A protein has these predicted regions:
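C-terminal accessory nucleic-acid interaction domains of nucleic acid-metabolism proteins
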Residues: 21-56, 63-66, 70-71, 110-111, ...
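Short polybasic linear motifs
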Residues: 13-16
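Short, conserved phosphate-binding/catalytic loop or strand-edge motifs used
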Residues: 189-199
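Catalytic palm subdomain of template-directed nucleic-acid polymerases
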Residues: 198-210
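Basic, low-complexity intrinsically disordered segments
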Residues: 83-135, 140-141, 146
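Active-site palm subdomain of RNA-directed nucleic acid polymerases
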Residues: 175-189
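Short beta-strand
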Residues: 77-79, 185-191, 232-236
């Protein structure tokens, strides 16, 4: 893929040259259709964002984003009519993936038939997905060929309102427990109101074991401040507290991919952060958009670049966690 870079950073959109301004100058060829279609209508202070803008974003961010997706089955959220029209979630691409694109076939939960998920292993694949009007990519917590064993643990902090101070405090509490166990904690905005805390795993445990491990950590965090935190799945029972959700730690479940755009006004991005950025005045989990993130990457790089060099085997940590909870 031909992307102009300065200092190792993606700088210049790929498609803004040629007859109609959008020519797919890459091998394999990716045909770009309807680049002027508005996917994000103008709203308040947000200007309209086109399909071409979305494609350009994913092309620019691809060198950073692809390593986080490589080997993971994906689910795509598509909005052919834009975000003000109903979109749909697609997992099975058995009949529509181009020949050159990677894929993984997994058995359906029912045991009847299979699902063919796209797998992003190259920059062109992100451009192809964006051209399918895919705004948001969600990825599994495991990679092939070891789909039964997660390589990351995830805590999804889901607030009841816009009080970010409570979300931030909860995120730091999760990180404190994770780090006390000897693991490394990473943080990402969701592009909405919450945060994801992620800890890389060594792939020695199945999903049930990992989820129970995460559930125990979440229990410690909630017990430390039950007034503001909860494990209650039902929204009606949360009483305005932050839900510390560990249910994504399951086979076939997904989390919003790092650097994915969300289908919300202004095109906010699910953005990996440095921990000190949580304390920046005015910080909002939806505060970074597809307009801002490529420039930010040139200035700060990828906070998750070393994540999988910090992976920990889970087995030795289970006794340590039991002692923390004693």
């Amino acid at each position: 893929m031909r992307i102009s870079r300065s200092g190792g950073c993606p700088r210049v959109p790929v498609y803004r040259f040629g007859g109609n301004g959008y020519a797919a100058a890459m091998k394999p060829n990716v045909s770009i259709t309807h680049p002027d279609r508005v996917l994000f209508p103008a709203s308040g202070t947000h200007e309209a964002i086109t399909k071409g803008d979305l494609i350009d974003y994913y092309a620019e961010i691809a060198p950073v984003m692809v390593p986080h997706l490589d080997g993971r089955p994906l689910t795509l959220t598509r909005y052919p009519g834009g975000i003000d029209k109903e979109g749909f979630i697609q997992q099975n691409f058995a009949a529509t993936l181009p020949d050159w694109m990677d894929r993984v076939e997994v058995a359906r939960k029912s045991g009847e038939g299979t699902v063919v998920h796209p797998v992003v292993t190259r920059e062109e694949a992100l451009v192809w997905a964006a051209n399918q009007d895919c705004i948001t990519l969600h990825s599994w917590l495991s990679r092939r060929p070891h789909l039964e064993t997660p390589d990351r643990l995830i805590f999804d902090l889901d607030p009841a309102d816009d009080d970010f101070a409570v979300v931030r405090a909860t995120a730091r509490a999760v990180a404190d427990v994770v780090q006390e166990l000897g693991m490394t904690a990473y943080v990402q905005t969701t592009g909405s109101r919450g945060l994801h805390i992620v800890a890389p795993l060594g792939g020695d445990a199945d999903f049930d074991t990992a989820r129970q491990f995460a559930r125990t950590i979440a229990g410690l965090v909630v017990d430390d401040d039950p007034l503001h935190r909860t494990l209650e799945i039902r929204k009606a029972g949360r009483g305005g507290r932050v839900y510390v959700d560990v249910m994504r730690n399951a086979y076939g479940q997904t989390g919003v991919a790092p650097y994915a755009v969300r289908a919300r006004a202004g095109a906010p991005v699910a953005l990996p952060l440095e921990w000190d950025e949580l304390d920046v005045p005015g910080m909002r989990p939806d505060g970074w958009t597809l307009r801002d993130v490529p420039k930010r990457m040139c200035e700060r790089g990828d906070p998750w670049a070393d994540m999988y060099r910090q992976a920990c085997a889970l087995a030795p940590l289970r006794n340590r966690l039991a002692k923390l909870g004693a």
